[in-house]
Amino acid sequence: ILEGTPGAGMGILLMLISLSLFVIGFTMGGLNYMITILQARTRGMTLMRMPLTVWGIFTATVLAMLAFPALLVSAIMMTLDKVLQTSFFMPTILKAGEVLEYGGGSPILFQHLFWFFGHPEVYIVALPAFGIVSDLISVHARKNIFGYRMMVWAIVGIGALSFFVWAHHMYVSGMNPWFGFFFATTTLIIAVPTAMKVYNWILTLWRGNIRIN
C-alpha cells in the first residue's frame, strides 16, 4: 500500500496487528459471556426472567462474535496487501504514467467488510445501554417494565436487523440501485423495534411512583 501520510508505514501495520489481537481476545471473552448467561444462571432464572441489561449484553456479545471476524479478515487482507504486495484491496494504479504491479483488487470490498462490522458495532455499544436504561426506569418508576417480552424481542430484533443495514453507509459507492433500495428499506424497518422500546419506557413511567428529591 502506498504511503500517503506520516505514520502510514509502521503505524498502520501496528494498528492492523493490534486490531487482530483485539478480535482474538474479544472472542475468548465473548464466549465467556455467552456460556455464563446460557449455562450458569441461578436456580429459577429463566431466559424470560433475566434483567434487560443482561439481555442487552448477551445480544451485543452475539453480534460481536458474528461481526468482528469481518474486521479480522479485513485487517489480515490489508496486512498482506501492505507486507506481501497482494492485491485484495488495490486496483490497477498509475504512478507517473507507469502501471504499478497491482491488479484485481477492490477498495469497495474493504468498505463492505468494514461496514459489515461497523454497523453492528453501533448496536454492540447501544444494546447494553438500552438494557441499563430499561432497568433504571423500572426501578425509579417503582413498577415492572411495561411489555417485558416485547422489550426482549425488540432487543433481539434490533440485533438481527443490524446485519442487514450496513450498506446504507455506502450509497455513493456506486452500488446497484436495487441493492441500495434493499438497505434503505431495512434501515427504515429497524426503527420499529427501537420505537417499541421508547414507547414502553414512556408507558413504564406513566403513573409511576417517581420521586425527585
Can you name each region flagged by the protein language model?
Residues 1-213:
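Membrane-embedded and interfacial regions of multi-pass energy-transducing membrane proteins
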